[in-house]
Amino acid sequence: MNAVTSANNNTDNRRLRLDVVSIFPEYLDPLRHALLGKAIEDGYLEVGVHDLRDWATGGHKAVDDTPYGGGPGMVMKPEVWGPALDDVAAGRVAGWELESATPHRNVARHDELAGVDKHAYEGEDADLPLLLVPTPAGKPFTQADAQAWSNENHIVFACGRYEGIDQRVIEDARNRYRVREVSIGDYVLIGGEVAVLVIAEAVVRLIPGVLGNRRSHEEDSFSDGLLEGPSYTKPRTWRGLDVPEVLFSGNHARVDRWRRDQALLRTQRVRPELLDAVELTTEDRKVLGLD
C-alpha cells in the first residue's frame, strides 16, 4: 500500500485504536476506504490487522481441530487464539497497519458532540480494551452499542470461522479484556469479518469530528428509536413523481413535524415493535391512529 501523508485535523487528539485478528487479513481492506480512510488520515482512527496464523505452529499452521463430542465442522484452537489475544492486548505485535486508501482535501472539522462514557458491566475494569467477538449466538448489535463504543480507546475484534472459537478462549480473555459476543443479525455468515466491517463503520462515524455535520447522525435511523423517514433532492419532479410540497415551505417547524410523522409511519409499517420503546406525544399518537 502507498503511504498517505496529510495534516492531522484531530485537534483534541482523541483516537480510537482498532485491532482485528483474522485468518483472512486481506478481507479487512475496506477499513481504509471512504469515511474510515478519511478518519485514519485525519488522526481519529488507527487500524491494525493481524493474521491469526502468525501464532499457529507446525508445518501446516493449523488454526482449527475437530470438535469434542463429535459433530460437523471444525473449531478454532485455543492454543492459537490465546497467545494472539494476549499479544494484541499487550501491544506486543505491530500487525499490518492500514493506511488511508485515498488522499483527501485537508478541511478543518468542527463538532460539538460530547462523547459518552465507556460501557462496562458491574465488576469490570473500564480501562481494559474491549474485545468484540462476532457470532450469531451473541447479543444483537444496536445503535446504542455503536454510540457507547465510539468513546472507546481500544477495540479488538476476534474473527471466528468454521464452527467458531473454542469457548475457553472467550472465558480466558475476560482476564485482559471486557468481552462482548455480538451478532449483527439473525443469520449465519461464513466468518466474522463482514460483521467487523459493519460494526467498525457504525462506531467510527459516531466519533466526534469524523462526520462534518453532527446532524448527519443525530437524525439517523434508531438515533431517536425510530426509522429515518424518506429523503429527497433535485430535481423537484422526476418521472412524474414530485417532492412533497412541505419541504419547500421554508417553515422549519412544519418540515420537522413532517419528518417526524414520516419516521413514525415508516417505523409503524416496517418495525412496529420499535414503537414500544418510544415516548410518543399526543400528536405522534394521532399520526399513528392510536387515539
Curated annotation (Swiss-Prot):
Enzyme superclass (EC): transferase
A molecular function (GO) term: tRNA (guanine(37)-N1)-methyltransferase activity
Keyword tRNA processing: yes
Keywords: Cytoplasm, Methyltransferase, S-adenosyl-L-methionine, Transferase, tRNA processing
Catalytic activity: guanosine(37) in tRNA + S-adenosyl-L-methionine = N(1)-methylguanosine(37) in tRNA + S-adenosyl-L-homocysteine + H(+)
Binding-site list for S-adenosyl-L-methionine: G160, I184, G185, D186, Y187, V188, L189
Matching Gene3D superfamilies: 3.40.1280.10, tRNA(m1g37)methyltransferase, domain 2
Subcellular location: Cytoplasm
Gene Ontology, cellular component aspect: cytosol
A family per Pfam: tRNA_m1G_MT
Enzyme Commission (EC) number: 2.1.1.228
UniProt cross-references to CDD domains, sorted A to Z: TrmD-like
A GO BP entry: tRNA N1-guanine methylation
InterPro entries found in the cross-reference section: Alpha/beta_knot_MTases, tRNA_m1G_MeTrfase_C_sf, tRNA_m1G_MeTrfase_TrmD, tRNA_m1G_MTases_N, tRNA_MeTrfase_TRMD/TRM10
Role: Specifically methylates guanosine-37 in various tRNAs.
Subunit structure and binding partners: Homodimer.
Similarity field: Belongs to the RNA methyltransferase TrmD family.
UniProt name for this protein: tRNA (guanine-N(1)-)-methyltransferase
Source organism of the structure: Corynebacterium efficiens (strain DSM 44549 / YS-314 / AJ 12310 / JCM 11189 / NBRC 100395)
Gene this protein is translated from: trmD
